[in-house]
Amino acid sequence: MLKTFATICIIGMFTSSCTSKKASRTEGSHEAEQELTMIVGTYTSGDSKGLYSFRFNEENGTATALSEAEVENPSYLVPSADGKFIYAVSEFSNEQAAANAFAFNKEEGTFRLLNMQKTGGEDPCYIITNGSNVVTANYSGGSISVFPIDKDGSLLPASEVVKFKGSGADKERQEKPHLHCVRITPD
């Protein structure tokens, strides 16, 4: 339960800071200028559906539910730079582990699943995009997976799965690599 709550809070904070402010519908509309679109990913072992969208008011701290999408364990997600797509992991410790692509309507807060691709590495716990590719860090798989993005925003099959090797001093916890994050540099 604590893990689910922490995931909701962390993803909500990151995605609300990564999405653009809703454009004012009328000049001088202060309330519309204070609203952000917030996307929340959850673990789905309980009653959760997976992905949720909210309209978040920065001024008074309220969130209004907009929509939901059923997807399993989207514990980490990232919006595309233009906000038209959401990419989310499905965190599993088996062959079900996947990256999902959704079309996203910011005005309505609605999701439409485009497709899902297997990561080839267990427990994807981080996802990032540079606009051309989506990359996952696969914690238990000790790997990263690279997915080219198709013209419609969907994900093509992994073009590469890079598996790391090695162990640490604590043989019980560090028997193999456990990736937490992958970042793309501008160079």
Place the predicted regions along the sequence by residue.
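An edge-strand/N-cap motif at the start of beta-rich repeat modules
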Residues: 25-56
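Short glycine/acidic-enriched loop and turn motifs that connect beta-strands
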Residues: 44-47, 91-96, 140-143
